[in-house]
Design a protein with these regions (language model features):
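Intrinsically disordered, low-complexity regions enriched in small/polar residues
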Residues: 22-24, 43, 65, 80, ...
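Intrinsically disordered, low-complexity regions
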Residues: 30, 59, 86, 160-162, ...
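N-terminal pre-core extensions flanking Radical SAM catalytic domains
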Residues: 1-29, 43-46, 213-218, 227-265
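Proteins with a high burden of low-complexity, intrinsically disordered sequence enriched in S/T/G/P/A and R
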Residues: 1, 56, 60, 122, ...
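Acidic-enriched, low-complexity/disordered segments with a strong bias for Aspartate over Glutamate
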Residues: 4, 30, 36, 44, ...
Length: 265
């Protein structure tokens, strides 16, 4: 199994507590990872061909050992993280910059909230000015496309181009079509998830949860516990694991959503 990228949810603790969070993160969330476990697991994966690790959550800046993990893995492989940005200021920002991550993306979950868009633009540009490669994870819902188009244009006008923005369609319900996502991106080439047009696993990617479970995708409920915190344990957990589609069905309770697809072995 030629895994090249792993995503690790360090915690399911997050002060933002978005209702749509695939990780069901809450302010009182928890973790089952120690710093030594994360470092040892990632180092073993790197020794077996993994080239990059992405840290998420929950909110990775609410995981107390994040900076130590980044520092201890410096030079081992490409290290990135995605944050909601609520803590990205003052001493926390200074410590993150000092830990020298290879890339940081700040999320815009609510493009209709002008204050959030303004904050994220400032944080992304501040990170870049301090030598940290940075970008935006931009969530798009089908029911709010006009606000998404306007906010995305604001981000691009601020000097953050599509090469630094990942446009993410809402999953489960209120899911935009690929064409609608392209309109938000300004009808120019853009980055999104590999499953944008078709649900299916990538043999290059694995998602590892805060509870030490593994999956082909961060959004799916098809998960399996790691038998050991090693690359071999990750491969064992992924082998034969299905992939349940993360979309919903059309119903009267919400906006149009994608239709479910069958399990993929």
């Amino acid at each position: 199994m030629p895994l090249e990228l792993i995503s690790i949810e360090l915690t399911n603790r997050c002060a933002k507590a978005c209702w749509f969070c695939y990780n069901h993160s809450l302010p009182e969330g928890d973790t089952r990872w120690t710093v030594d476990q994360v470092v040892g697991f990632v180092r073993d994966c790197a020794a077996n061909g993994v080239k990059a690790v992405s840290f998420g959550g929950g909110e990775p800046l609410q995981y107390p050992g994040l900076f130590e993990i980044l520092e201890r893995l410096d030079g081992t492989l490409f290290r990135s993280l995605t944050t909601n940005g609520l803590l990205l200021h003052g001493d926390t920002l200074d410590r993150l910059v000092a830990a020298k991550p290879n890339k940081v993306h700040v999320s815009i979950h609510f493009p209709d909230r002008a204050n959030e868009v303004t904050r994220v633009i400032g944080q992304v540009n501040d990170l870049a000015a301090r030598g940290v490669k940075s970008g935006v994870n931009f969530l798009v819902t089908r029911s709010n496309l006009p606000a998404a188009r306007e906010a995305a244009q604001r981000v691009r006008d601020a000097g953050i181009g599509n090469d630094r923005i990942v446009y993410l369609p809402m999953r489960g319900r209120d899911t935009p079509t690929p064409n609608e996502l392209a309109e938000v991106a300004g009808k120019t080439p853009f980055q999104s998830m590999t499953c944008l047009t078709k649900c299916g696993p990538s043999p290059r990617f694995a998602s590892v949860g805060w509870d030490k479970s593994a999956a082909w995708c961060s959004y799916t409920v098809s998960r399996r516990p790691l038998p050991s915190l090693t690359h071999a344990g990750l491969v064992a957990a992924m082998t034969g694991l299905g992939l349940e589609f993360c979309g919903g069905t059309e119903d009267a309770d919400g906006p149009r959503a994608a239709r479910p697809l069958p399990l993929v072995a």
